[in-house]
Structures are given as C-alpha cells and as structure tokens.
Amino acid sequence: MNNNTNGEIIIPQEYLEKSECLFKELKELNINFKEVKHGLAATIKDLLEMNLENSTNILKNLFLKDKKKNYFLICTLNNKTVDLKNLSNILKTNNLRFVDENNLNNILNIQPGCLSPLAIKNDKENIVKLYFDEEIKNMQEVIIHPLHNYSSLYIKTQDVIKFCESFNHAPEYVQIKEDTTSKARVDKKEDVQEEMAKNEELQNNNNNNKNNSNSNNNNNNNNNHIKDTILKGKLLSNNEVEDNKSKDSNILGITSKKIENFSDWYTQVIVKSELIEYYDISGCYILRPAAYYIWECVQAFFNKEIKKLNVENSYFPLFVTKNKLEKEKNHIEGFSPEVAWVTKYGDSNLPEEIAIRPTSETIMYSVFPKWIRSYRDLPLKLNQWNTVVRWEFKQPTPFIRTREFLWQEGHTAHKNEEEAVKLVFDILDLYRRWYEEYLAVPIIKGIKSEGEKFGGANFTSTAEAFISENGRAIQAATSHYLGTNFAKMFKIEFEDENEVKQYVHQTSWGCTTRSIGIMIMTHGDDKGLVLPPNVSKYKVVIVPIFYKTTDENAIHSYCKDIEKILKNAQINCVYDDRASYSPGYKFNHWELRGIPIRIEVGPKDLQNNSCVIVRRDNNEKCNVKKESVLLETQQMLVDIHKNLFLKAKKKLDDSIVQVTSFSEVMNALNKKKMVLAPWCEDIATEEEIKKETQRLSLNQTNSETTLSGAMKPLCIPLDQPPMPPNMKCFWSGKPAKRWCLFGRSY
C-alpha cells in the first residue's frame, strides 16, 4: 500500500487528474458516490483482501476482443469465473481473448487493473460494446474503480448506467453463468497484472524502510519502466528498483513520452506548464495567464490586419431564441445536438427556451436588414471576440475540443459574389499567417467537401493542421462563403445602383483557442512545452550559478546588467534569483514552461565577461561575450522561430502519401499518415469511405498496435498537383475531379 509517513494514501498525480475529471463529469450528471481510498489493488483478489464493506458488490470487468477485432467490455460479479468460450457463444462471436495493454490504453485510456464501466467514456471512436451481467440489474449499488486502482467508488447501479448512456454507451444485458466445471481461460495479461502488483508492493516495502514520501514519488515516476520490464518477463530485484528510480527523480517533469502515450503527455504538459487548470464542469477549463498571453498575441495581430480590410469590431448578445436559431434548418442541423438551452430563471420556467450561442449567424443576421437598405450601406464588415458554447458529449480535450471556447468570428455582407469570395480567401491567408508567423505551425489551405462544409454555406475554405505523433488532422480555422442563403432567410436586401432589389452575398469566418492546442502538440517535446518566441511572455530566462566560494553579489549584479540590456531592447526576460532552488531545478522549471532562451552565468563567465546561451528548441549551447548578448539573442529568437516552423513543415510534408487506389490507403493510415488521392467528389462516397476505413481499422490482424478510426475528406488542397489524363477516383472508379486530402481527424 502506498502510504506517506502520516499513514495517508498516496495516489499518483496522473491518476488523481483522471479521477478528478471523472468526478466532475459525475457531479455534472447529479450522480452521487462515495470514494474509499485503499491503496494499490491491481486485482480482484487484492481488492477483496482490503475487506471493503459490501465487497460482494465489487464488479469484475473484462476487456475482450474477437478475431475480427470487435471490442467488448464485460461487467459481471466478482465471484464468477468466466469461460471465454461460453461467453463467445453468448455474444455470438468466436475466439474471444483479452485485449493487450497497448490497446487497453489506446482505446480506453486506462492501465491494467484499473478497468471499470466508467472507462467507456474514453471510447472516442465508439467501437466498444458494453455488456452487463443480468444479475447486476438486481444490485442497488456496485463498487468500481474511478479509472485507477488506488481507490473505489460506491455508486448506485442506475447511476452507472446513466453515466454510460450519457456517453452513448447504453449497456446490453447477458446471462453469464458461473463456470463450475473448469477454470476459465486466463490471458497472460492477468499474470502481468499480478506481477506488477507484486513488484509495486516490493518497491513500497523497500521505500518504507527508507524515506516513504520521496521514494514513493520516485516510484510513481518509474512505473512505466517497471511495466515495460515486467511485460518482458522480468521481475525487478530490490537493487534494480533502486537503480531505476534514481534515473528518473524529477517528479515535477513530464513522465510520459510524446511518441508513446500522446494523450497523457499532452495532459501533463498543459497542466505542469501552467497553461490550463481543470474546472468542475467537464469540457470547461481555466486559461491561466501564460495561455491567455498567447491568445492576446494572436488577437493583437489579427485585429491589426482585419482593420486594414476595414473590418470593425463589435459585440452581439450571448443568447438567442429558439425560433431565431432554428430559422435556417440546414445551418442548425449541424449544431442541434450541441446547443445548450436556458430553461429557468430562479425557480420559474422561462416562457420560451433560450439558447446559448453555438455561433452567431442567426443572432447577427436578424438585425442586418435594419442596417442594410442601399448599396451605399455595403460592404458591412464586422468581427467579434467572444465565447461560444457547444455542449457535445465527445471526450473533451483542453484547447482542442471544449464545451466553451474563446474565438473570433467575422461576418460580412457584400453586393456581389466576387467581392465576398475575395474576402473569404483574404481571411484564409490571414489564418495562415496567424499560424505560421506567430505559432510557427504550417497549415494546408483547402476547400471542404460537400459533406464537411459549414451548414448553410456555398463553400467552406479551411486551414488544416496535422499531428504526426498520433496521426490525426485538426481543423485549424475556416472561412465560409455563404452566398445568398442566409440573406434570403433573413431578408437582407439592398437596392443597387439601378434601384433593383438584390440579396447580399455573405461571408463568415472564425479561429479559436484550438490554435494554442495545435501549437502545443506540434512543438512540445518530452521536456514539456516549447514556445515560439512570438507568443512567449518571457523570451529569455537568466539563471545565476553559485558555488560555495562564489561572489554572489558580483554574479547578481552581472545578471541584472544583462537583464537591463535585454529589457531596454524590448526583449521581455525574467531573472530567476530564487535562493532556495538549485540551477538544475531552475533549468527544468523553465524548460517545462517552454521559454525560448536560457542564459547561464557562473563564476567563469564572470571572469571571461561572457555567458552561456541555451536554445530551448534544440538544446544547443554557445558562449557569448557580454557585449554581444543583445545581437546574439535577437538573432537566436529569429532562428528559433524559423527552425520550429521548418521542422514542423517537414513533418507535415512527410505525413502526406499520394495514392491512386484504395488498396494503398490502410497501410498509409496505419503509419499515421494522410493520403492525397484522386477523387470524384460524389457526396455519397464520403460516408462509404468512412464506414469502410472504420471497418478495416477494426479488422486489421497483422498488428496489435494498429490505429483505429475512420478516414474522412479533410480538404481539397488549393495547391493541386497535376492531374494525369483519364485519372480515376481511388474509391468509385469514376473520373476524378481533383486531388483530395483524406485522413483521421479530431
């Protein structure tokens, strides 16, 4: 059991973060529960030995797959021995076996020994079928893990069902009989869990003989290495445990590798670098000052540029009536599942439901007819910086997919199509600059397919980014040509020069705080955040290095001189003169937060009238004379931005595979690539391609680490390769119209 010197249960931080997020989601659904902390319990046997009250209510949970890679989460009573062959017959499948640890983590984002029905919330692709033993129906309360095995929840059975249903996973019920004739088949992964539990106990006993608090923290950091070793069939000795702990003593740093566990890496980076703080409403997050500073930087750039296009800032209300919101049917269909409604004030019901804006087209366009009467009133160009709410129940990801987010949304009205379309692409190019010049992120400009375009638009232009570590594209920004669709709905007309009534041609365009998440995913590394200089609050951190015989006052004065030189040149920097922390601690502290440049000053630097400059992006060091510090720093900031962009651009380019037949697609997708394919652009093929790639993803048998998820059209790139004569569509065989970029996406 993991205890500190006071006898308190110590739960690893990464597990605490998971359970805190879960608890917020449960409370949001008005679900009550009682948590009992008991220390590590990797198996049912361990949990039963904890002597919990009503232990017969502890559920046994099995994560299984069949030969065709259909996935099943089975929940039954803890005293039942399950025969997988018999269970295969019940589920009308064959060859059921336990899912390996990699896929357990990839699909349900959970570690062995931590499984519970609540983990179904992490099934982002909706590929897992949830089954409850029929006997669970008769249980008033169950005992399950809160996504980790250091505590258990006492929770009403109906509330567990309610929670699963809220994530679109209503359980099906099956009759699971006790296998009394023979032991059920047990996968080796259960043996691995037993070994992991033994090894954890061995470590904890050893830790308790030394320094409980510090040793246990180091033990948590080294957990991934321990698991890897056990999975290879080796149980660590006491000495080996101590050796491994000493290799990873920085408990404040990032403990997951970006390439190995991207989701956990991302969560650690945004929290430990002090960008995000979790909130008690799922999908809503606190943007801390470092994150909001990034938003202010891109906001200042965009404001300056749109004003050159004669766009004016304004603000429209947060609320919209149901009648107004539903006026444009095609438009609202895309948002209706996500709209949050206000139905009460105090204890009274509102006479009419009021929606919280998911976007502002219908809010703004209802007043446009009052402002636009003549061609002299055009063009009307407005922008607003605000928040919107989209109450979706997909797995939230800070910055990337949230229920409330900051954005800018622009809306314009023009007298003709030519003028409106020009603005659409002018704005799209500003989004390119937003990403390239400030976030050092390359994007692909293109046009959305008919099935992916904005509801109510004639066409949608898009900026697409790509995260090579997990093989997923992200829509970075969009700019829409709405034609006269909304003008006809809201009767936005003007009298032209010939006194003829015409409908206005409209545009709308937006970019969100998602851009910050894309930047983090693109540049971050195993040390933490990597900030492009143009959005880093502090460009430079100055760290003094003292020894016992050091003249601290002299070094302090020297560092202050460098600080003054940089600040006088408008380079914001911070002098870290904290006396209670070592230089190494300070290095890690600022590397985690992504500060572009570190300047080190020690006794030798003082003697040589120099300093050491270290780049965050590539860890290169150089010795620089004091008189050259300003010029070197200025050039280095430029070089860092350029290097970050070029490195990301190469990753993006290397992630595109050109294909001409569908047989080439899955190989590319499973290598975390996008595919550029000749396409007929038939809207019916979009859903066909999604379904087939989803099916093939689940049925892959050649690799246990195959990625899952459907492929969809991301965009038709504006920069088109030459199309050979008579080229056929890679899917339908019909004549191809253009090259289209396909891939998995967020």
Curated annotation (Swiss-Prot):
Residues that hold ATP according to the record: 390-394, 401-405, 475-477, 512-514
Molecular function per GO: Ala-tRNA(Pro) deacylase activity; ATP binding; proline-tRNA ligase activity
Compositionally biased intervals (Basic and acidic residues): 181-201
Annotated region described as Required for editing of incorrectly charged tRNA, given as residue ranges: 1-223
Region called Disordered, residue ranges: 181-226
Regulation acting on activity, per entry: Inhibited by the quinazolinone-based compound febrifugine from the Chinese plant Dichroa febrifuga which is used to treat malaria-associated fever. Also inhibited by febrifugine derivatives such as halofuginone.
Pfam families given in the database record: HGTP_anticodon, ProRS-C_1, tRNA-synt_2b, tRNA_edit
Keyword Nucleotide-binding: yes
EC number: 6.1.1.15
Catalysed reaction, written as an equation: tRNA(Pro) + L-proline + ATP = L-prolyl-tRNA(Pro) + AMP + diphosphate
Keywords on record: Aminoacyl-tRNA synthetase, ATP-binding, Cytoplasm, Ligase, Nucleotide-binding, Protein biosynthesis
GO cellular component: aminoacyl-tRNA synthetase multienzyme complex; cytoplasm
Compositionally skewed regions (Low complexity) per UniProt: 204-224
Biological process annotations from GO: prolyl-tRNA aminoacylation; tRNA aminoacylation for protein translation
Subcellular location: Cytoplasm
UniProt binding sites for L-proline: R390, H480
Xref: HAMAP family: Pro_tRNA_synth_type3
Similarity field: Belongs to the class-II aminoacyl-tRNA synthetase family. ProS type 3 subfamily.
Role, per record: Catalyzes the attachment of proline to tRNA(Pro) in a two-step reaction: proline is first activated by ATP to form Pro-AMP and then transferred to the acceptor end of tRNA(Pro). Functions in trans to edit the amino acid moiety from incorrectly charged Ala-tRNA(Pro). Has no activity on correctly charged Pro-tRNA(Pro) or Ala-tRNA(Ala).
Descriptive protein name: Proline--tRNA ligase
Organism this protein belongs to: Plasmodium falciparum (isolate 3D7)
Annotated gene: proRS
